[in-house]
């Protein structure tokens, strides 16, 4: 992941999508 630490960052992306 270019922005951070793989799955942890993907989870953050999901959180933003659900927000």
From Swiss-Prot:
Source taxon at top rank: Eukaryota
Main location per the UniProt record: secreted
Tissue-wise, where is it found?
A: Hemolymph.
Compartmental location: Secreted, Extracellular space
Keyword Transport assigned: yes
Keywords in alphabetical order:
Copper, Oxygen transport, Secreted, Transport
One GO CC annotation: extracellular region
Do the record's keywords include Transcription regulation? no
GO molecular function terms attached to this record: oxygen carrier activity
Q: What does this protein do?
A: Hemocyanins are copper-containing oxygen carriers occurring freely dissolved in the hemolymph of many mollusks and arthropods.
Q: Describe the subunit structure.
A: Composed of 3 major subunits (IB, II and III) and 1 minor subunit (IA) which form homohexamers and heterohexamers. May also form larger structures.
Q: What family does this chain come from, according to its entry?
A: Belongs to the tyrosinase family. Hemocyanin subfamily.
The identity of this protein, by name, is Hemocyanin subunit III
């Amino acid at each position: 992941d270019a922005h951070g630490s793989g799955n942890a960052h993907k989870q953050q992306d999901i959180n933003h999508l659900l927000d």
